[in-house]
Amino acid sequence: MMEQYYEIKKQYPDAFLFYRVGDFYELFEEDAVKGAQILELTLTHRSNKTKNPIPMAGVPHMAVDTYVNTLVEKGYKVALCEQLEDPKKAKGMVKRGIIQLVTPGTMMSEGPNDAKDSNYLTSVVTTEKGFGVAYSDLSTGEVYATHLKSFEAVSNELLSLRTREVVYNGPLTEQNKEFMHKANITVSSPTPIEGEHAEISYVGQNLTNSAEKKATEQLVGYLLSTQKRSLAHLQVAKSYEVNQYLQMSHTVQNNLELVASAKTGKKMGSLFWVLDKTHTAMGGRLLKQWLARPLLNVDEINHREEMVQALFDGYFTRENAIDALKGVYDLERLTGRIAFGNVNARELLQLSRSLEAVPTILDALDQSDSDVLKEFAQKIDPLKGVAELITTTIVKDPPLLTTEGGLIREGVDKQLDRYRDAMNNGKKWLAQMEADERQKTGIENLKVGYNKVFGYYIQVSNGNKNKVPLDRYTRKQTLTNAERYITPELKEHENLILEAQTRSTDLEYDLFVRLREEVKKYIPALQKLGSQLAALDVFCGFASVAEQNNYCRPSFHTDNQDIDVVNGRHPVVEKVMTAGSYIPNSVEMDSSTNIYLITGPNMSGKSTYMRQMALIAIMAQVGSFVPADSADLPIFDQIFTRIGAADDLISGQSTFMVEMSEANDALQYATKRSLVLFDEIGRGTATYDGMALAGAIVKYLHDKVGAKAFFATHYHELTDLDETLDHLKNIHVGATEENGKLIFLHKILPGPADQSYGIHVAQLAGLPKSVLREATKLLKRLEAQGSEIAPASQQLDLFAQPEVNDSEEVQAEQAVITDTEQNILDDISNLYLADKTPLQIMQLVADWQKDLKDDK
């Protein structure tokens, strides 16, 4: 057996080999040692009596999926080696072979948290002109292809797709290997495929670009070689260009938190969290795809908005459709499992129940007053025949396994009914036969019996042998005092009774497979229906969100890049705040203004204001309504951001290098139709270097790029740029002081901020009083120095001993007042001495002293 194991293992050296032995899958050698550690299995040994016992660990075959998923989730591959013949019938060694190679990009099972996530396997081929890229989610059969000019563009696509595995046809540079490793992407080599396969030609039939075609052939070839079965559900590849959509790099999508919070990596806190009111897994996946690829075509956007508008206006239509959608399972992945051959009876019933919900959805749409909803409904095929086929074949509550019987309804197959009748009524039939034969023959002591050697028989005593009807009875066994006989009828029922269970189970499985193969004929229609219901689910969700959050339908213009958003709101921030407490802000940028230079204190809302604009643009071009009183927008072709201060762990770049790289992307690739968000450019380096770079970048954006840009800064010297840059406008986020406390107004106001309130924000953060006092002194000195930018040799040494007069130092120390100090000052101011005795005043002073000591 071990020779067979080693021979198979040789073919899959980079995978865990799960080797079927009876009711277990066994791991041997290094696989066992490593697998036992990862899967928390008991490590044993085979051939313990030898000098070199073989490490071994096993898992029950019934639970193998759980263990396989654990390994694959960690980035490993698993080769499933199955027994290919019945061990009882095998002559010699049981024949075994690999039935499937499970890899990170081909895993089809899912947990409760990833039903709305796609699992993409991506194929990349190098060509003379660049790269061909094709990717697929095996569980749904969708296939997409494109071509890119640089590996940087490929890397961005891989990150945006959240690809788990890449099939790459060439050697990777060390830098690219490092990228794949840090991005947690498994890299696999292409696998040669022998002979012609219909799937390869079918999937790539509409591709005209040679790079895309090669990438798709490599993709499908890898899937066929690893899955080792027909993949009839793979769809015709859809070719696309990245510039067909609003382009956003992976970094931009992360900065704007489109599908996950930047802090937690979870759904909560993202735009997806706000917009996801879908009730199907496929609707959730489609929404994520739309958020990553907003549209550029105004007609397509308007069509989506018309659907949302109709569902927004038609409350009962929407609610009836939603109620029906709640009963729809994941048609796309159910279809994939049907094609894959691992669907069970319960899942087929899920399919039929999903199809049974479609007529209700169609009725809701047909009864609406909206032509666009009626047109949408007319394109949907409810596939009634498929649902009926399943429900008339499968029992209402079938078992999970398809090999143990109990799947098929009565009346579906006459032979199966006879088997079941034999199983359920065998003893009753034998008793009845015994009574009938006694009556027919007149032999009162005739009996029907059974033994394991001869099976069922009719026993007649020697005294009654002359009454036996030999034309019907055949002698089977002679005893001392009796004879045993068999009849054709008894023999027939003997076979039914003894083999009914086995034959019934086998026949049920055969009937189930026939049903599955019949349903498989409808795969293209089921996939189309799934995509239609997914889109409807998203539209209903958009309408619900718009109603709940008081969104408006945006309008678009293509003759200029003017922005007019009245009382816009950040969709995520608004949701986590108390209802009605969010302070809205407008954006009015006509042809006279291309750049908003935004100043104001930290925490005042500068970043929120900028992100708000980007999210409104994305929501609008996805087809959603937007959080504003009104919005008239241009079509943006790209969004660039420089937000946040963090090192790029994947590329190994420092904070400042990341900052400059992201700024460079905008300066190099932004067009007049782009939206640019820059937050605190230059803070990753020395003050004057940063200020100089920030000023130069603003000027370049103004003079060379011409995009609509939001530029937040603490370099107040930059606000003077409005004197020389005609299309730059200063705005600031309002703040005020009350009783020494900083109050954020969160309102966008014209002109630059008069100060940044940095020390006040530090006070809110709880910095020690001594630090705040020292900062106040230093601020006084810097303000005394003046705002002119001096060369490095003349820049102020912050830590040199200054010449500060006593009055300035006192003013500096008094500038920072804690809450405790303010309360004491208020008590003194309100104290009426005539009402207090000397002892009471002494007690008050003692209390104040104690409070001041506790406050230090």
UniProtKB/Swiss-Prot annotation:
Keyword entries, A-Z: ATP-binding, DNA damage, DNA repair, DNA-binding, Nucleotide-binding
Family: Belongs to the DNA mismatch repair MutS family.
InterPro entries (alphabetical): DNA_mismatch_repair_MutS, DNA_mismatch_repair_MutS-lik_N, DNA_mismatch_repair_MutS/MSH, DNA_mismatch_repair_MutS_C, DNA_mismatch_repair_MutS_clamp, DNA_mismatch_repair_MutS_core, DNA_mismatch_repair_MutS_N, DNA_mismatch_repair_MutS_sf
Keyword DNA repair part of the UniProt annotation: yes
Molecular function terms from GO: ATP binding; ATP-dependent DNA damage sensor activity; damaged DNA binding; mismatched DNA binding
Residues annotated to bind ATP: G600, P601, N602, M603, S604, G605, K606, S607
SUPFAM superfamilies according to UniProt: DNA repair protein MutS, domain I (SSF55271), DNA repair protein MutS, domain II (SSF53150), DNA repair protein MutS, domain III (SSF48334), P-loop containing nucleoside triphosphate hydrolases (SSF52540)
Protein name: DNA mismatch repair protein MutS
Species of origin: Lactobacillus acidophilus (strain ATCC 700396 / NCK56 / N2 / NCFM)
PROSITE patterns: DNA_MISMATCH_REPAIR_2 (PS00486)
Any Gene Ontology biological process: mismatch repair
One GO CC term, this protein: cytosol
Function: This protein is involved in the repair of mismatches in DNA. It is possible that it carries out the mismatch recognition step. This protein has a weak ATPase activity.
Record-linked CDD domains: ABC_MutS1
